[in-house]
Amino acid sequence: MIRHRHIDLICGGAILLALALTGLLCFGEALGLRPASAAPGYASCLFDDGRVHTVDLRVEDWAAFLENAPAEEYIPCTAVIDGEEFYQVGLRAKGNNSLRLTEEYGLSRYSLKLEFDHYVDGGNYHGLDKLSLDASFQDNSYLKTWLVYHMMAYMGVPAPLCSYAWVTVNGTPWGLFL
């Protein structure tokens, strides 16, 4: 047990400080604090289901990337998303089981992860710092994941945002991703 002659004052001060901070956070809007957006900027951009989006990845040595993909190491690339360019974006192959199975099946179309702030501090896509592109190589319909995410959101269960993207690498078609 803590024994200090001023412990009551210290604990009382900590409680008052906690109550003051709680009050500030509860009534922050009245004091001019802005709440976090319920719909971040990227939700209406890339995750708009009204169309298939385009993502062009500009990579210096794509063959070397594919060869080293199982290592899951980031390389720099330029990502052009719906015509908007983002420089020095981190790119790596994504997955654990899917990465292993892609290798096992002899495929080269990996799921990908983009990290906008990997090389540039504060880099983001309309507030989003990471983006996963799912190759859906085990789903020929490309619908299972999309349907599950939308059903979860419809039922009020937190679910990732998703939409379809046509991905090209250095201008060459690479396929449809989710």
Language model features: what each stretch is:
Residues 1-178:
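Phosphate/dinucleotide-binding and metal-coordinating scaffold of catalytic cores
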